[in-house]
Amino acid sequence: SNLHEEALKSKAWPFDEARKVLKRLKGKLPEKGYVLFETGYGPSGLPHIGTFGEVARTAMIQNAFEVISGMPTKLVSFSDDLDGMRKVPGNVPNQEMMQDFLQKPLTDVPDPFGTHDSFGAHNNAMLCRFLDTFGFEYDFYSSTEYYRSGAFDKVLLRAVEKYDEIMEVMLASLREERQKSYSIFLPISPKTGRVLYVPMKSVNKVDGTITFDDEDGTETTLSVTGGNVKLQWKPDFGARWSALDVDFEMYGKDHSTNTHIYDKICRILGAPAPSHFFYELFLDENGEKISKSKGNGVSIDQWLTYASSESLSYFMYQKPGTAKRMHFDVIPKAVDEYHQQLRAFHTQDVKAQLNNPVYHIHKGNVPVSDMVIPFAMLLNLASVSSAETKDAMWGFINKYAPDASPETNPVMDNAAGFAVRYYHDFVKPSKVFRSPSDQERAALRDLAAGLVSIETAKSMIDKKNLDMGKDPVDLTNYSLSDGDDLQSLVFAVGKNHNFENLRDWFQAIYEVLLGASQGPRFGGFISLYGVDETIELINQGLNGELIN
């Protein structure tokens, strides 16, 4: 089909990555009967925006792969919940109680929130709730379950058998100091239940056991099977790929230097290494890496307080190979660009559609946007009207789009509520109004005069055209309720008052009337906010009543 042909050539990055997966498989379905796309989750903290990004992007590649290959696939979310708790995360209650459980597997640490059997189980539940909220289709696998149920026994026994080979790979990557005590096996102490980082005294290939000194110095021998022992994280990666026959895994740039290690170990343990894809990490507004336990940057819940999950998926689609700052200012832009792309999609040919982010966000099943007003404009409305509720916002929306309603435009309705919230939390605290300069004051007076009388408005536009040496424009149908006509007036006033750069005039409008340094097309804003209301706003700005 045309779609299939275009997908095979498409330059969109999910198709690029999907073609690599297909090439690795030499176009053949694996013996297990499906192609496995894996994402990993370290449940030391709550799922964060990076977790979402990884799963969302993997799902985009998985979908692109299905389109080009027609093969069945599976998305697995694998939680490393047998890892020892290295430190108590700063963002959980009952910190003191948690201190007693350091180094114990996360699934053996009590849940500080008191809702689950363990801290690991709590964070796993958060992950699943989180993935379910976004409608991801995935299978959840738990490391604890895989180790303790014996599902990893075969690969663990093979690791004992290939111990020297795996150690050789690992030691080459370690500093001398670390080499002395390093072991690929981490026994779980039968006495304290802690995950131990201790050197091996012996590794017995015949009976699949390891011998080491426990924390109290007692020589101890354990079978590597049944969850007595886990693998260090680098060998663990390779072993998991081998045990599950993983075909694709993406991860953050911080892992990229270790990939060849994971791959080698996977091969030593008897399976081909998967396809990989690296993405750059997210930074907070200060350019620092976002971390789970620190909780800096924008959390998922915070994003969803001010915008839809689709806008977040849109943000994740953009240039995965570039480090992106994740802070609150990016939200309005992501929302508006997402809706621009939705509108564009339904007019595009197949090639352009496959290149459109919304194709990948919605797996080809792209909805129609009902956002009749951009989010940035809603924010300015909320700002200038000090709207406290969604209903107040609808009063303005209906001036502009009389047929729109919360029932027929549910996305718009949500956005109106988001705008009120975003305004209160981010715009209001940072609003700074200023007095106009003499030039700006005169121009604002003229703008108000043009809004009062349509004849005055027309004569201002005529004057601008005359001064610019342009032919007069036919203004018979000129209307003060049309956003474009109002924009012509704002433009003409700026020109007539000799603003060298019209951006300075628009900036003055925003700073004096809205208390912000940038804003929407002001003509569109007037048509939404109302002509009389805008005249009143200009007068308040001229009288200094807006200055806090």
Where are these regions (language model features)?
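A glycine-rich helix N-cap at a beta->alpha junction
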Residues: 95-130, 134
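Secondary-structure transition/capping motifs at alpha-helix termini
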Residues: 66-71, 267-274, 500-501, 548
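Residue-level signal for inorganic ion chemistry
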Residues: 48, 159, 308, 509
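Basic, alpha-helical terminal appendages of large translation-related enzymes
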Residues: 1-34, 47, 72-76, 167, ...
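Active-site cores that bind ATP or allylic diphosphates and position pyrophosphate for catalysis
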Residues: 136-294, 300, 468
